[in-house]
Amino acid sequence: MNKDHTLYCSVYIRNAFFSEIGIGISANSCLLLFHTFMFIRGHRPRLTDLPIGFVALIHLVMLLLAAYITEDFFMSSGGWDDITCKLVIFLHRFFRSLSVCATCLLSVFQAIILCPQSSHLAKLKQNSPHQLSYFFIFLSIFYTSISSHILIAAIPTQNITFVNLIYITNSCSFLPLSSSMQHTFSTLLAFRNVFVIGLMGLSTCYMATLLCRHKTRSQRLQNSKLSPKATPEQRALRTILMLMSFFLLMSTFDSIISYSRTILQGNPLPFCFQILVAHSYAAVSPLLVLSNEKRITNLLISMYEKIVL
């Protein structure tokens, strides 16, 4: 293991990552509190409110774990025992897997909601919440099981003289896999990512097509080049499309950086940038949702009127 990893990671990257975590924790907390408050006040929830709130909860826990891991990466001299090392790294990977699966579920669920009655997907509308719940459980188990080798490969680095350890933090590293095992896991990881990202990409393209059709039809009805005022459903669809597009973009960057790490094994900078990219979706996604949520403005106005009156 290269002990100079933290020296090469610039202080700017460290500050950027802690800023990213701080913003992400604050934004996800606000989004989760907003949905909780709307539920307590008795507002009728949208069909996508529960998945979005669930994603916010997953991201909140994931970022808290990431903050604990990053503190050991940048500041600690290494003090985790074997159980802490395996548990923290596995839980962090587990919640990252839940984030991917829940985002995929949200994309598919929104596509089913928006599909016309003539579509084959319309048959899934009535039972979609239950069917998608089973699909989410299956996808999460499948997605997480491919990373289950972490429980064996993750080891504390205190008083260990192994060479060629894969660096994670000052306290924890991965044992190198054999060439056959590495090839097997690489194939499974590639299949997993292609399946999930492909499914998400198809549903995103489908929603974008529906949005364009609806916009064109509205312009024809109004006989004007100016598009009519966006409905709440259209704003929700645009929010989902922005989330999916940003997620696909960050996933592509993450894959590129992961590949570069295999080529530049002695250079820690790709690992530092991968930390930033891997958590950017969890930090930015609640901001995208909050910025397009008109109910927040209405809620603040109603609370202000009650206070004034």
UniProtKB/Swiss-Prot annotation:
Membrane topology: Multi-pass membrane protein
Segments crossing the lipid bilayer: 20-40, 50-70, 94-114, 135-155, 188-208, 239-259, 269-289
Gene3D superfamilies: Rhodopsin 7-helix transmembrane proteins
Residue numbers on the Extracellular membrane side: 1-19, 71-93, 156-187, 260-268
Molecular functions per Gene Ontology: pheromone receptor activity
Chain ranges on the Cytoplasmic side, renumbered to this chain: 41-49, 115-134, 209-238, 290-309
UniProt cross-references to PROSITE patterns, sorted A to Z: G_PROTEIN_RECEP_F1_2
Entry keywords, A to Z: Cell membrane, Disulfide bond, G-protein coupled receptor, Glycoprotein, Membrane, Pheromone response, Receptor, Transducer, Transmembrane, Transmembrane helix
Disulphide-bonded residues: C85-C172
Name of the featured protein: Vomeronasal type-1 receptor 52
Organism: Mus musculus
